[in-house]
A protein has these predicted regions:
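Ordered, amphipathic secondary-structure segments that act as subunit-interaction surfaces
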Residues: 50-99
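N-terminal ordered "arm"
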Residues: 1-25
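Flexible helix-coil linker/hinge segments at domain or subdomain boundaries
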Residues: 24-27, 66
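Helix N-cap motif at beta-to-alpha junctions
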Residues: 59-64, 103-107, 166
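Short, charge-patterned binding micro-sites
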Residues: 26-58
Length: 241
């Protein structure tokens, strides 16, 4: 499966596996430190093997079974062809978790936030400014679905976004939040208050928020979500309202 990798490519693959496994590997001294790992004789390209060895020096003891287990868990059982499309072209479904922290004395309700998002969806998009350019966030194209639930406190809501991304555009959660905030004030986005892309937004009805991208997945020809690693399925559940 990997016989067409050159020796240096094999070395780099093993080094990445060790890092993913979280093993406490040692590094060499000198001007250009690197992982202290030694390999047996190199194989010619095109020659496969079922018995390869390497020495890995570590800074602390790790039991043999644990080390092998962590290495195995960090090793993908697949080879990705170099002609495979770039991840930016493959990963077209992205999920976000947004924690909304509201004013404890006068919090907006989940129903109000939901109504604001639904109003924006009905308008199909959000016009906003980014620097000197005017842009539009196409919600028909980028917002697949969402789920809004109560958080741990009355002034905390959790917004889950299921989004689509490609060369035509991708979701910008901060633009969606900024436009929803304007609606929650009883104003019209882009008319009574401009929507400007400035990274983290300074909102009125939302004291603060935290955005976390929680998953990235591919879509197959039938629209099913799959992992970019062909032999694995992706634990990504789309969120719908």
């Amino acid at each position: 499966r990997l016989k067409y990798l050159g020796h240096l490519e094999v070395i780099h693959t093993i080094e990445r596996i060790v890092r993913r496994a979280g093993l406490p590997y040692a590094v060499t001294q000198g001007f250009s430190p690197h992982m202290r790992v030694g390999f047996s004789s190199a194989l010619p390209v095109g020659t496969s093997s079922t018995c390869e060895w390497y020495d890995l020096f570590m800074t602390e003891f790790v039991a043999l079974d644990e080390a092998f287990g962590r290495l195995a868990a960090a090793s993908q059982a697949a080879y990705i062809d170099v002609r495979t499309p770039a991840l930016t072209a493959q990963l077209t479904r992205l999920s976000y978790r947004i924690d909304l922290h509201l004013d404890a004395e006068a919090p907006v309700s989940a129903d109000e936030v939901r109504a604001a998002i639904d109003t924006l969806r009905a308008g199909h998009g959000i016009d906003y400014a980014r620097g000197k350019k005017s842009k539009r966030l196409d919600l028909d194209h980028t917002l697949v679905g969402y789920e809004l639930t109560a958080g741990e406190r009355p002034d905390h809501l959790v917004l889950m976004l299921d989004t689509h991304a490609d060369n035509e555009g991708s979701m910008r959660p901060e633009i969606l939040l900024s436009a929803a905030d304007v609606l929650l004030q009883g104003l019209t986005p882009g008319v009574d208050a401009p929507i400007v892309s400035t990274g983290m937004q300074d909102l009125v009805t939302i004291c603060s928020y935290d955005v976390e991208r929680q998953n990235q997945a591919c879509e197959d020809d039938e629209g099913r979500l799959v992992s970019p690693i062909p032999v694995r399925t992706c634990g990504f559940a789309p969120h719908t309202r």
